[in-house]
């Protein structure tokens, strides 16, 4: 990477402008810039331009905008019958914004297929700060003994939610977290869940890949709009089975049937 002519962001100036996401490199694909810091001002500026940080310990902060972009329309989440059986069988409790740091820390744990993690302690500190400011949110899945077994976190901006990472300690726990997130986003009027990188796992649940230029157009549109006033309020309740049934009734996906 040392031979790449890459824009460098001044770490002392959080207002230092990002290059356009349209100018991202072809190799490494989607790399926009390096350097800077993880201050709230810079992070929110990045997300507003369709750019996010992704790097490993020991590297400079690297900023990305991949093409194509992974997205999921909240009302198009596919509830497969196996996931529906899990919902009916498991006595799990789902909350949001009750354990943001614990969710991030769990997401940072090494996976069986990877030795390291991109969720560094600096990242945890930065996103916890955004959570305190009301910009970052989490969904938590708890087992019947009160153990945290799954979750997801991300950034909210207008009617767009940027999903960052999720984890699972029990089969389907992360899928349940993503389902509840999608359902709440849909009810609250959000139009798009940005999953950043396309994947077969997310495509199985209704995700898709769209060209970056299309994503940036949606980004500009939806970040200028506002979700429902009760979005992310702790007293908001949602019957997930009623939501799933309503989506099946609208023809969103035949596998969503509650029967």
Task: Indicate where each model-derived feature is located.
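N-acyltransferase acceptor-side catalytic subdomain
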Residues: 1-259
């Amino acid at each position: 990477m040392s031979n790449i002519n890459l824009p460098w962001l001044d770490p002392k100036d959080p207002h230092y402008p990002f290059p356009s996401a349209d100018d991202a490199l072809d190799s490494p694909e989607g790399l926009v810039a390096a350097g800077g810091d993880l201050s709230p001002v810079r992070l929110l500026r990045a997300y507003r331009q369709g750019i996010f940080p992704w790097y490993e310990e020991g590297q400079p902060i690297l900023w990305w905008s991949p093409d194509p972009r992974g997205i999921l329309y909240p009302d198009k989440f596919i509830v497969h019958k196996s996931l529906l059986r899990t919902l009916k069988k498991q006595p799990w409790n789902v909350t949001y914004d009750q354990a943001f740091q614990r969710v991030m820390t769990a997401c940072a744990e090494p996976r069986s297929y990877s030795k390291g993690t991109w969720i560094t302690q600096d990242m945890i500190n930065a996103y916890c700060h955004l959570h305190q400011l009301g910009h970052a949110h989490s969904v938590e899945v708890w087992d019947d003994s009160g153990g945290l077994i799954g979750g997801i976190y991300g950034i909210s901006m207008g009617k767009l939610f940027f999903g960052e990472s999720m984890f699972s300690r029990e089969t389907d726990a992360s899928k349940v977290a993503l389902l509840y997130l999608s359902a709440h986003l849909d009810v609250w009027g959000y139009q798009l869940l940005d999953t950043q990188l396309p994947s077969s796992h997310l495509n199985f649940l209704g995700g898709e890949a769209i060209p970056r230029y299309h994503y940036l157009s949606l980004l500009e549109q939806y970040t200028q709009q506002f979700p429902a006033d009760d979005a992310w309020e702790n007293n908001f309740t949602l019957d997930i089975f009623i939501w799933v049934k309503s989506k099946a009734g609208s023809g969103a996906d035949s596998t969503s049937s509650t029967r």
